[in-house]
């Protein structure tokens, strides 16, 4: 049986465990994975041990920190193909993704996150609790929407952006920006 692992082991990874693994009654949980000195270790029921990179493993990016998300992604990209078999989309039972939306791979939808009609979602995006993406939107890859953040209708954002808690985005956003306190900061 193929196992699913959470990449990360902090408090956010514990939240992902409760909202995804426990709430969906997933029985093939393999453990939490950490990186130390560019080596992967699995923390499971029997303690921590070197990760053996099983060929059928599946992964959930279980950190909200953009830097750690990038480290995990880059590390495991060297061992696993970018496909839905290794990087499934995972959703809390009370999240919603419109049937008319298009969704890539490796996305994580936590409790009460909402993806409305005719929206395109790229790969490896994180929608935290109570986030929403309105109709006719598009988001690229590797974006983090913190709790209670929203993207207004007909808005597109590119890649590797961070919307801080409670922010509402009304205009398109280029790559590598942070929206906080109503101000967009380019990540130069």
Model regions: which residues?
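Flexible, charged surface loops at secondary-structure boundaries
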Residues: 1, 26-27, 51-56
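Glycine-rich adenosine-cofactor-binding loop
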Residues: 2-20
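Residues at the starts of beta-strands that form the adenosine-phosphate
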Residues: 3, 28-30, 58, 86
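Short hydrophobic segments within beta-strands
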Residues: 6-7, 62, 164
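Short, solvent-exposed amphipathic alpha-helical segments in soluble enzyme
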Residues: 20-23, 76-78
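NAD(P)-binding Rossmann-fold cofactor-contacting core
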Residues: 23-41
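Phosphate-bearing ligand-interacting subdomains
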Residues: 39-92
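Structural signal for interior beta-strand "rungs" in well-ordered beta-sheet cores
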Residues: 89-188
């Amino acid at each position: 049986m193929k196992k699913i692992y959470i990449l990360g082991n902090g408090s956010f990874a514990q939240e992902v465990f409760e909202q995804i693994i426990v709430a969906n009654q997933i029985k093939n949980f393999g453990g939490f994975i950490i990186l130390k000195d560019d080596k992967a270790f699995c923390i499971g029921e029997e303690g921590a041990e070197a990760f053996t990179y099983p060929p059928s493993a599946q992964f959930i990016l279980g950190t909200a920190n953009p830097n750690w998300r990038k480290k995990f992604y880059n590390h495991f990209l060297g061992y696993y193909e970018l496909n839905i078999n290794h990087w499934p989309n995972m959703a809390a039972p009370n999240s919603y993704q419109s049937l008319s939306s298009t969704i890539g791979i490796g996305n994580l939808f936590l409790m009460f996150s909402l993806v409305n009609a005719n929206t395109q979602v790229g790969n490896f995006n994180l929608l935290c609790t109570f986030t929403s993406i309105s109709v006719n939107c598009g988001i690229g890859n590797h974006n983090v929407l913190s709790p209670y953040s929203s993207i207004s209708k007909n808005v597109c954002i590119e890649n590797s952006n961070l919307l801080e808690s409670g922010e509402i985005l009304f205009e398109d956003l280029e790559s590598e920006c942070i929206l906080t306190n109503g101000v967009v900061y380019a990540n130069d």
